[in-house]
Amino acid sequence: MCIMGNELFDAIKPDAWEVATAIELFHNFTLIHDDIMDQAPLRRGMDTVHHKYGVNTAILAGDAMMIMAWDYLRRINKDVMPEILALFNQTALEVSEGQQLDMDFEKRDKVSLDEYVNMITLKTSVLLAASLQLGAVIGGAGEGNARHLYEFGKNLGVAFQVQDDYLDAFGDPAKFGKQVGGDILANKKTFLMIQALEASPAADKVLLQELMEQNPADKVQQVLDIFQRAGVNEWALELKNRYIEKAMHHLDEIAVLSKRKEPLRQLADFLVQREH
């Protein structure tokens, strides 16, 4: 993302590789710690770090990645370093806030769609958006163009999460690479769960609450049946498309040649049409 943000405005500069590496290290740090908090057994079709090596080792591995990320950032040109560090650190704090909200929501009976979108924006979208903007800063983009690129990434990130929530419920385990139904088992308030609690008839709403409290062996299948009765799979597709449209509007507003934006359009298509 960072490299693409740079390349949208100028030839790739050495600083872009340093920042991109820092972002990737930070991202994997968050995934390792998120998997611990979620007690997730799989990530990308393989054992999670804590599942394979233990929680203590996983915590330290994540911490080491965060330290390494800052080490890469210290190597960049001093002219752009203040702006890069400010955005990177702001994003890291927002991602942490988003993860805390995600955990808080698991304990609440009701979460609004607006609250969930805010949580997802912080936990997921801002990192995608900041990666693009960091590259844009290195590439010499003006403030307006950099902001439109950020908003493109932010809206694309929400669309990505809608797709991720959908795949967690309805995806093919062989393609998804994670435990299908994991969000349901963890009582996560996903886009699908929030809509089901809002749109389902009274009897299904009561059943959903009972399933979250009692955790029967067939919990995942029962919840999926409720999702389908409420039509949340079609609703999720419509919601995803709305955020894609917002993202593309901001991409169109960036004042560079259209052909330079084509890789970002292709990336957007890949992220929101993926099956893994």
Question: How should these model regions be labeled?
Answer:
Residues M1-H276:
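All-alpha prenyltransferase/terpene-synthase fold signal
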